[in-house]
C-alpha cells in the first residue's frame, strides 16, 4: 500500500499524465483540488445530529460545517433555519490522507465492490459517488451506531474533461469497472 501524497503525485502521476496527454504547460496537468464529504439528515433529533457530526469528524479528521434549511418544507417537517446536514471539505495533506484510506481500506470493504462506476463523472472532470452506510470506515464502531447513514463523496479535480479526470484517478489507484 503506497501512501498517496504530493511526492507520489509528482513522481508517479505527473509523468504518466504528461506521457499520455503531452501537455505544453505544467499548469495544464490535472491535479486534485479537494474532496467533499456531505451527509444530509433532514428533520432528526439533536442527539442524532450530534452523533452523526461526531462520525463525520472521526472519518474526515476535521469538524464538519453544519448546513441549514433555506426554506420550510411541510411534507418533510423542515422549518427554515433548521440544521439538516453537514459537509466537510478536505484539502492538501488531509485530502491525500483521506484518499489513501479511501482507496486502500474503504473501497475493498464495500459489499459487492467490483470497481467504481465510470459514469459518475459530472462532465467537468469531477467524480461523485455515494456510500450506503458508514460501516466501511475503520473509525466507526459497529456497536455504537444506531442507524445506517450514508454519505456523498465528491472528488474535485482541475481536469478539463472526464477522460483526463478518470486517468488521473486511475493513476492515483482508484479502480473503475
Curated annotation (Swiss-Prot):
Keywords annotated in UniProt: Chloroplast, Plastid, Ribonucleoprotein, Ribosomal protein, RNA-binding, rRNA-binding
Organism in which the protein naturally occurs: Cyanidioschyzon merolae (strain NIES-3377 / 10D)
Single GO term (MF): rRNA binding
Cystine pairings recorded for this chain: none
Signal sequence annotation: none
Protein name per the record: Large ribosomal subunit protein uL5c
Top-level taxon of the source organism: Eukaryota
GO CC annotation terms, alphabetical: chloroplast; ribonucleoprotein complex; ribosome
Primary role: Binds 5S rRNA, forms part of the central protuberance of the 50S subunit.
Family indicated by similarity: Belongs to the universal ribosomal protein uL5 family.
Gene3D superfamilies per UniProt: 3.30.1440.10
Oligomeric form and interacting partners: Part of the 50S ribosomal subunit; contacts the 5S rRNA.
Pfam family, one: Ribosomal_L5_C
